[in-house]
């Protein structure tokens, strides 16, 4: 970018420039290779923090498990996971006392959700551990596979389409002595190619039925697959994140629904709201503390950091919290909510792909799968890896590690926030019974603590008491990484507060630029990002105008669509020049067709096609927006699309932008290299499921009808619908008798084929 950075700082106060010190420009770091090492680190660290707990063995799976609950109270500042049950329950009781009826009301709201949620709720989300294939899959495919397996094993409650009925099947599946699954495998054979007469490897994909006994099934059902967290800025080391399987997901969803409902009612919770709403909520708490700290009181704020939040949380503690929160509720509701924490207390972490070995001398590479780590000779590994493996060995079963304590990242964000807020709640004067008092904000593992007291000693005493109270519930405030300031300056979830929130503009930098979806979407997303930042992030008019010019420049270079009258030569310039010369109204050409840019900061809210429509030549309009044009992939034309925008920090955000379908809204085809691998069978299944879904939507155009999950139930629904429609059409004379009987014949054939398949 040809911008002199010093110009940006001429007229802004220093605290506004803090955001430019962030590692947010440029590409974020990605991980390569396997996540096995990072996962072992997580498992070993988690056990180390709880090492003084009690060891037991799971009777079903034989996995060794460590239980640190009610363990020894810490004597030093090292992080530890020894939460005390009675302290957690007491914190919950005080939270309820300060917010009468909060748990009761949230339970009622959740009960309603539990009874209404459909099983297709689980198709949301990206990669999911698919226990039938023992690898990650898109959520919809993983769910379809699970349901297919359940049905072929006689578990059919899920056919009602309600999530709660699917969860009944999950519970029953765990009691079965064995389960039959279909797996994909790959055969390789050497054959001679007729054309070249060379030997080539031919791959064929097969499916085979396999029986899994109760123990192996339970291990799979309790497994969290692990991957490396990508694109994390400001860190030297990568870390592992977990993706749970379909058995756990539904239960977690209900627990988080309950916790979300509680968080919405707590003024100290930074979840589930975001953006400007969150800023307003936080500003309220700060205002309260500053108005209450009369002239006699001091007020200080800690920008807090917790050490290894997830690894010191404990599912058994969450079970205690849920038991308390649901204390007067119906038995079925209490049971369904307690299953998630119980499953997490028995969870297994899958170690990923294993290690890759390379011999430079012999040019050989070989992969040691995670399953072999239990038995392989350790002389091949370097010292640090050897230590890791030695430590983890007692915990290994079938390539997964037993991991009872700890929570893994991002599983119970809402519920852990409730725990954090319950400690902030204890800072009221009626509980501290002394001259100091505290309040604050909590959002998952991030917190800000505001302490008020008559003098510095009081502030110190307040902070110490908060620190010790946290230790009792397994929260470890880091003394090294937290810092304290006079109230009025602090940071919370990357929002910087200085007598009001300062716009942290650099957070948004990565989302500027060309997304690379297609010409139409990229233009729309680019201007929407600039518009949104003018609204939310103090992006001033001059800077916005500059951002817009840079974006257009970037866009033209990306798609090689410089103006038709430019001197720049690219692969497209010949065609674009020709178009420019034939066009009467040149202002009507889209930027991607070599036209001029008509955007300025006043009209960013208008899609480019609409902005230029009146200026376009008629034949250009006809080519651009013609549903019969074979290059336009018209999905249904929605007025609003969602783009995934990467802010520099936190999860990818979904951002709405206006979508006008034109010849520029193409969808790229999938990379073909996958077709030669063992993933191919899985890909074919996925495509089949996709085709089936598309067909289904043609049969049931009404959006009020929710589609069932799994191919078999969809086929049943379509066949019966076809019969009904055919009968109505026949009786009203819209189709002839021959056509009617042909439709009936096809329906019977489909059913017959399905019976044979089963």
Curated annotation (Swiss-Prot):
An example GO BP is: DNA-templated transcription
Q: Which cysteines are joined by disulfide bonds?
A: none
- The EC class name is transferase
Q: Does the keyword Protease apply?
A: no
Q: Which family does it belong to?
A: Belongs to the influenza viruses polymerase PB1 family.
- What does the subunit comment say? Influenza RNA polymerase is composed of three subunits: PB1, PB2 and PA. Interacts (via N-terminus) with PA (via C-terminus). Interacts (via C-terminus) with PB2 (via N-terminus); this interaction is essential for transcription initiation.
Q: What is this protein called?
A: RNA-directed RNA polymerase catalytic subunit
